[in-house]
Amino acid sequence: MALIVQKYGGTSVGTPERIQAVADRVIRCVNRGNDVVVVVSAMSGETNRMVGLINAIDPEGSAREKDVILSTGEQVTIGLLSMALQSKGQDARSYIGGQVKICLLYTSPSPRDS
């Protein structure tokens, strides 16, 4: 049994149908005897939509608040994917970053610094 980490970008989870397809892939991996951790991005277009909202309010606003707003896209996707897995009989639970203990060995510069 292996621990498999799968990462899906916005296009891969961009519609309910694509989220269902990701759920099927996860289940196949679990059925092969693996433990699976899934990391997902916001659905396609959501991050750009939120950046537009941020810029409409205050483009120079707090980096912390921008991060809070932008993280909501991933929260929606993880909830939807967990629901899709559960609807197919697969035990699943969504977590946001603060709920899991991850040790960062390296952090790259913020995209805002580029």
Which residues does each predicted region cover?
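Nucleotide/pyrophosphate-binding catalytic subdomain
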Residues: 1-108, 112-114
